[in-house]
Amino acid sequence: MTTPPFVWLISGCSTGFGREIAISALEAGDMVAVTSRNTEDIRDICNKYPSTSVALNLDVTYTDQIIECVRNVISKFGRIDVLVNNAGYGYLSAIEEGEGEEVSKLFNTNFFGALELTKQVLPVMRNQKFGRIINNSSQAGLMAN
């Protein structure tokens, strides 16, 4: 088992829970790969914690970006102890009114993006014989309103 400080890879850190989880982990003394589709949105976090964080561009709908991100985390920190699948967004519409293209885009981000990121990180965790994966979702995905 790995002991602290832990190495975190967190998707979707520009706002909300992803941002707060990244800051909390850094304040606890852990190392964090802070990701966003636009690294300017997370630059302030990494400027505050320059030796224990790295800002990485990541759009989870692109497998090549996921692969590159995981490689960069391993290159910077040597391992990944905690993966937080947080990237995602909501689409407010009744299911029968949802536009096919928009619903497809939502699933590509919220489900398939997390799945692909997990697929790329799992071999790393298996190799190091330790790892935790946290999947963040919306209450709307669990309970109808």
Predicted features, each with a name:
Residues 14-16, 38:
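Conserved glycine-rich cofactor-binding loop
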Residues 28-44:
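Conserved glycine-rich Rossmann-like NAD(P)H-binding loop of the short-chain dehydrogenase/reductase
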Residues 58-68, 100-101:
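The beta1-alpha1 cofactor-binding region of Rossmann-like NAD(H)/NADP(H)-dependent oxidoreductases
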Residues 72-85, 91:
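A glycine-rich helix->loop->beta "capping" turn
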Residues 94-95, 99-104:
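Substrate-binding pocket helix/loop in short-chain dehydrogenase/reductase
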Residues 118-119:
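A short, exposed helix-loop element centered on a Lys and neighboring polar residues
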Residues 138:
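Residue(s) in the substrate-gating loop at a strand-loop-helix junction
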